[in-house]
Amino acid sequence: MEDTHMKFGYFDDANKEYVITSPKTPLPWINYLGSENFFSLISNTCGGYSFYKDAKLLRLTRYRYNNVPFDSNGHYYYIKEGDTIWNPGWMPAKTDLDAYECHHGMGYSTFRSSKNDLQAELTAFVPVGKNCEINQLTLTNNSKETKDFSVFSYVEFCFWNAVDDSTNFQRNLSLGEVEVEESTIYHKTEYRERRNHFAYYTVNSPVAGFDTSRDDFLGVYGSIEHPETVYAGISHNSVASGGAVIGSHHLKLTLKPGESKSLIFVLGYSENDPEDKWEAPGIIK
């Protein structure tokens, strides 16, 4: 039988997947999610972005094409157990993992990784007929002791027009608007002024904290590889008004030996009819 294994992965014909066995590919290896109006690009290290219909004019999340290193902005999950911080897709913390696989399939990508007997399985997909990306993160304690740890989600919102978002810096610093309600973060930049659409980022579990200010989350001297909030283990509950806007949930989990917990994160787009946008003069829905 022909050996289909290559240096960085192999084709799984039975499951119609390409399985990547190392996160350190020569360049980002990207899958395309979505089929109708909502689309996402996702790399083998969870880099990428989402958009609704038009990648230039209706971009939900930021992606910097000339970043150093490559592919260092995406939809990330930081797992903090004690002093160990890692990501299911390796980036951006780049902590050495005990196991790693990325399965790029037809309309979905699944990441399977582990560190210190804590296993993570992350599946990202865009459901047919829905304007959102769903990420299911399942965590399993494979050790013989109870594990206490935190999960921090992270996306950076784009101010919709991708070209203006990356060029008009002076204006962009004063635009950002968010609202936070329980486990849902709403990105409403210019919704009151001139737009009828907004983005939201939510999770199916109560949160211990949140952040919507990138500066507060990363810290003055932090970075996406080393966010000060994650290393401190405490969110700021920041509500951004201007500046760079992000969505970050902080969840605290306890798993007994052999126990699993699934978290469902939804990043979505919503649009209202202009006549249905206002509850009363000056009050938006």
Predicted regions and their residues:
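Anionic coordination/interaction segments
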Residues: 1-285
